[in-house]
């Protein structure tokens, strides 16, 4: 088997051609071939997470990254490959444990593309017989990898001006000094620490601190502009204790040791901003960030990078509002100092967060449980809910006139009237008696449990009506639907209103105060003005039998009038079950008749008669009804489900259908069934078509094979996401989902796989794994491998390119996620074929950022969509983007209400060598192929689908837990001993279609 043309990549390879490592034998490709019919290896480009890639792009200058083999998934280590290094990179190196090999490359010749027959005789794929690779992943390093440099800026599209909520920060040259702070006795509260340091500065600024005003992070670090008059010094500060009512108590002494650690200046920062240095000076950025956060940290409630306070609304009444059930929201803002092309910028955005209402605990319980009569004992289930929601809250003690406070550790299992405790003289007394005698207070709600403070071994019991929840305590539990609606309604702002709120915040916060001036910082009050481009929408192809065969969307929208699905599915076996008790008996028949008529009118083939007669069943018997349908109609293609009138059964239905019976289902709300609305039926028809194997539309350029770096070679586009449990669910696993396109060149059908992993683990663990099989021993497995096998089965092709859209990764995790997940991808590829190294473009998709783009002229219909937001297709890759790396903001959708949030795409690896225009156009065009509606969507569909699939799998897990179905679940143990409840397997026929839509 020939390896000419470059199978491996990485370290020591020569240009694009079939270069061979000097230490590599010529017959190194003798392993068992796992892709039957494949006679030659497929070229990938060098370095995996490209040790040699520097910024990993075609012809893009010199690599300055020096990555070790233990940190980077180098393909030669995985596949023994040779071939391409980084194309056009003049120099690159890979450091191994023993030596560093440097190779100079100037070859520009494109290697020949190996052709693969589209019809292959044997599609069964077996495991390789080579010795299995170690599955331990390389260690993560936050600075191990440098990412691709920007391949120039995009030029396509209509140029427009927009404003962004980024404010230019100018910094004068200063020497910055870092001091370690040690406060004794140690306290957990940042607030107390800050109060100690404020008093220290007040008392000693002129006498001992050389007149300097330091910036303090609330923990261990103090920063000054210029040196203090000492290297190390200890101070004594007497801080008056603050009572719960705000008054001052007795003084408490603190010893504060301040010791010089290091100093820096702004030279490295300027070098980075001038693009003369690759490594960002994060230590310097941290100092400046602490300076800008110093004042708000003292004045407001700090939550991550956000600040909240009731004074941050338009007026005193606007700063807070009720969400229901004893919860309220506070207005606030997000603040982050960022490195951008225009220099340092301060990203400011308005925000809101949920807090506990500062009310008496009995009032809270009345709201939280929606009960009026507090003279009755709580049910056990309600008592547990109250215990969970109140635990760790701080309360004022009203029988001490609010001067004392305590922390709730739990609530009693018995009503307070039944609680007794033993006195020092060994006599017993009830809590009710104690409060009557000690405080002359008669407990009002004696049927309620008592608030417990202190430990379980030495509990202190307090009547609920004498405990008032302290103000400013964050509510971290999941908001219910009513609360979410109330929060959205209160915080939803149209673009001009949001922009004005942001401007007012910047003025109110006065970032140019004395402390900022001392550090040489000044912040402009004007939003950044940026040149953006509006990319043209793609032409969409529909079936030739429709009146309209092609559509050019306008402002991110179109409709299905006179159009037919490009590939209508054929449904020959279907039926309907209704679990609603409120709809008329004959309505399911009429609804299904009209729904099927809609499906047929849009291009599907649908047998009019159901496989078995429709079933009506009370919601208490969902499982029995579904099992009966499966027994009476084996091989059912589609089950239309009319949901129960009360919410809560959707997850159970999906779990049973998709993991136990192998039934594809379409659930419909009874209120929608009642309406018989045509638009609703059209939307449902779109979902049914893709769930039964059809395609609604495709990009015309895909049909014409006119998408650069996609349609020229077999390409698989993948989306990946990890969803985490809600706060408070401490034992629930995180769920990873990976979807992959199964049709090339159309790239429209996405197969979905899911996997459970350790609680709040962001890195996807099951992309590649070795599984111990009782008969076969160690067997290659994992999500990537399974998708690749399915791709070949569906297309007869082997992917030569991978476009991997990864959702849900924060900036601090970029290197770690790339290193681990690229290692897994390379191992999965190598398990299918030695030296099989397809080229990978790895793109992070971010929606949870705070950059907002506003039209230059609000109300100008030529510059906005109908909602007043910037137009769909607006892309920004200048000024507010990274100074060096390949990233861009793309607003691909039309706004509905409020202010649109553009998606942020950041390229971590690009072995395919996309230009800015190519990747931006591809991403924008894909946003028009989302299957569930005739609108462009806000993030690229593969990432969107991965999110939907992971969210669907959460139902499987939640149903398992809520139904007590332990017999169905499996568990495994991680390397650190954590037991993970495994997801029930999705049936094969279900996961072959877009079941999650």
Curated annotation (Swiss-Prot):
Keywords: Magnesium, Manganese, Metal-binding, Plant defense, Repressor, Ribonucleoprotein, RNA-binding, RNA-mediated gene silencing, Transcription, Transcription regulation, Translation regulation
SMART domains in the cross-refs: DUF1785, PAZ, Piwi
Region of interest: Disordered: 1-144
InterPro entries: ArgoL1, ArgoL2, Argonaute_Mid_dom, Argonaute_N, PAZ_dom, PAZ_dom_sf, Piwi, Piwi_ago-like
Biased composition (Low complexity): 93-106
GO BP term, example: defense response to other organism
GO cellular component, one term: cytosol
Obligatory cofactor(s): Mg(2+); Mn(2+)
Annotated GO MF terms: metal ion binding; RNA binding
Residue spans of biased composition, Gly residues class: 1-16, 43-59
Pfam families, alphabetized: ArgoL1 (PF08699), ArgoL2 (PF16488), ArgoMid (PF16487), ArgoN (PF16486), PAZ (PF02170), Piwi (PF02171)
Residue ranges occupied by any PAZ domain in the UniProt entry: 360-471
Domain spans labelled Piwi: 638-958
Functional note: Involved in RNA-mediated post-transcriptional gene silencing (PTGS). Main component of the RNA-induced silencing complex (RISC) that binds to a short guide RNA such as a microRNA (miRNA) or small interfering RNA (siRNA). RISC uses the mature miRNA or siRNA as a guide for slicer-directed cleavage of homologous mRNAs to repress gene expression. Associates with siRNAs of various sizes, from 21-24 nucleotide in length and preferentially recruits small RNAs with a 5' terminal cytosine. Probably involved in antiviral RNA silencing. Associates with siRNAs derived from cucumber mosaic virus (CMV).
Protein name per the record: Protein argonaute 5
């Amino acid at each position: 088997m020939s390896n000419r043309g470059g199978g491996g990549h990485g370290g020591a390879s020569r240009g694009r051609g079939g270069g061979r490592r000097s230490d590599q034998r010529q017959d190194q490709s003798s392993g068992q071939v796992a892709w039957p019919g494949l006679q030659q290896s497929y070229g990938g480009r060098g370095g995996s997470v490209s040790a040699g890639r520097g910024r990993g792009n075609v012809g893009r200058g010199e690599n300055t990254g020096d990555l070790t083999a233990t940190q980077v998934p180098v393909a030669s280590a995985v596949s023994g490959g040779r071939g391409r290094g980084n194309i056009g990179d003049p120099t690159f190196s890979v450091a191994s444990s023993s030596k560093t090999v440097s190779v100079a490359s100037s070859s520009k010749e494109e290697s020949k593309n190996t052709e693969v027959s589209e019809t292959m005789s044997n599609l069964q794929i077996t495991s390789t017989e080579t010795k299995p690779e170690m599955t331990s992943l390389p260690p993560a390093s936050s600075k191990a990898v440098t990412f691709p440099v920007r391949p120039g800026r995009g030029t396509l599209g209509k140029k427009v001006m927009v404003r962004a909520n980024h404010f230019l920060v100018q910094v004068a040259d200063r020497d910055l000094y870092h001091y370690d702070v040690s406060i004794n006795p140690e306290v957990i509260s940042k607030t107390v620490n800050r109060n100690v340091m404020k008093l220290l500065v007040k008392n000693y600024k002129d006498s001992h601190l050389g007149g300097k005003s330091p910036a303090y992070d609330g923990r261990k670090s103090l920063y000054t502009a210029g040196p203090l008059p000492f290297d190390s010094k200890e101070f004594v500060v007497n801080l008056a204790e603050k009572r719960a009512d705000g008054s001052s108590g007795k003084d408490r002494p603190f010893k504060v040791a301040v010791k010089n650690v290091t100093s820096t200046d702004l030279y490295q920062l300027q070098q980075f901003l001038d693009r003369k240095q690759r490594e960002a000076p994060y230590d310097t950025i941290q100092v400046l960030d602490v300076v800008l956060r110093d004042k708000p940290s003292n004045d407001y409630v700090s939550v991550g990078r956000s600040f909240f306070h009731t004074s941050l609304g338009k007026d005193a009444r606007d700063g807070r509002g009720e969400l229901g059930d004893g919860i309220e929201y506070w207005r606030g803002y997000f603040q982050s100092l960022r490195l951008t092309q225009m220099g340092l910028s301060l990203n400011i955005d308005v925000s809101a967060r949920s807090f506990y209402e500062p009310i008496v605990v009995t009032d809270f319980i009345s709201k939280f449980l929606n009960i009026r009569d507090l003279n009755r004992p709580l049910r056990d289930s309600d008592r547990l809910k109250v215990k969970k929601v109140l635990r760790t809250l701080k309360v004022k003690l009203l029988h001490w006139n609010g001067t004392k406070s305590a922390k709730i550790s739990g609530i009693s299992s018995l009503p307070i009237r039944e609680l007794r405790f033993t006195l020092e003289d060994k006599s017993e007394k009830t809590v009710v008696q104690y409060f009557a005698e000690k405080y002359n207070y008669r407990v009002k709600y004696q049927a309620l449990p008592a608030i417990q403070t202190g430990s379980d071994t030495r509990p202190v019991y307090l009547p609920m009506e004498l405990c008032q929840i302290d103000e400013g305590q964050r509510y971290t539990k999941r908001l219910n639907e009513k609360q979410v609606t109330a929060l959205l309604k209160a915080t939803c702002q149209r673009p001009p209103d949001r922009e004005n709120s942001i401007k007012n915040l910047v003025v109110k916060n006065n970032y140019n105060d004395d402390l900022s001036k001392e550090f040489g910082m000044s912040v402009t009050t004007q939003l950044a003005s940026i040149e953006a481009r509006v990319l043209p929408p793609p032409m969409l192809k529909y079936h030739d039998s429709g009146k309209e065969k092609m559509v050019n969307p306008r402002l991110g929208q179109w409709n299905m009038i006179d159009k037919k699905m490009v590939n209508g599915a054929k449904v020959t076996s279907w039926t309907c079950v209704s679990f609603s008790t409120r709809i008329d008996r004959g309505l399911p028949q009429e609804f299904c008749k009209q729904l099927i008529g809609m499906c047929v009118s849009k291009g599907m083939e649908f047998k009019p008669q159901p496989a078995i007669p429709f079933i009506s069943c009370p919601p208490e018997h969902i499982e029995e009804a579904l099992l009966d349908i499966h027994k009476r109609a084996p091989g059912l293609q589609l089950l239309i489900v009319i949901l129960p009138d009360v919410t809560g059964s959707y997850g159970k239905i999906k779990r049973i259908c998709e993991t136990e019976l192998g039934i594809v289902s379409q659930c419909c709300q009874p209120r929608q069934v009642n309406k018989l609305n045509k638009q609703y039926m059209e939307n449902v028809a779109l979902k049914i078509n893709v769930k039964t194997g059809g395609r609604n539309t495709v990009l015309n350029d895909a049909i014409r094979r006119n998408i650069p770096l996609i349609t020229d070679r077999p390409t698989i586009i993948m989306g990946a996401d990890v969803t985490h449990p809600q706060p408070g669910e401490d034992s629930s696993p995180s769920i990873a989902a990976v979807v992959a396109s199964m049709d090339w060149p159309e790239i429209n059908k996405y197969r979905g796989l899911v996997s459970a992993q350790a609680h709040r683990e962001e890195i996807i663990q099951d992309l590649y794994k070795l599984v111990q099989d009782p008969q076969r021993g160690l067997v290659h497995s994992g999500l990537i491998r399974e998708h690749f096998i399915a791709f070949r089965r569906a297309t007869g092709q082997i992917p030569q390119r991978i476009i991997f859209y990864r959702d849900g990764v924060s900036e601090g995790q970029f290197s770690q996620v790339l290193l681990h997940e690229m290692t897994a991808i390379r191992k999965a590829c190598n398990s299918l074929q030695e030296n099989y190294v397809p080229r990978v473009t790895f793109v992070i998709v971010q929606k949870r950022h705070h950059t907002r783009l506003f039209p230059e002229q609000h109300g100008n219909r030529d510059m906005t969509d109908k909602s007043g937001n910037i137009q769909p297709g607006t892309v920004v890759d200048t000024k507010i983007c990274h100074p060096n790396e390949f990233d861009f903001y793309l607003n691909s959708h039309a706004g509905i209400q409020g202010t649109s949030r553009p998606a942020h795409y950041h390229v971590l690896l690009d072995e395919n060598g996309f230009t800015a225009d190519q990747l931006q156009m591809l991403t924008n065009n894909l946003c028009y192929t989302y299957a569930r509606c005739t609108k462009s969507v806000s993030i690229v569909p593969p990432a969107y689908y991965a999110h939907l699939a992971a969210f669907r799998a959460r139902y499987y897990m939640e149903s398992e837990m809520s139904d007590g179905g332990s017999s169905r679940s499996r568990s495994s143990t991680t390397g650190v001993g954590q037991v993970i409840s495994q997801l029930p397997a999705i049936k094969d026929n279900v996961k072959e279609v877009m079941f999650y839509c």
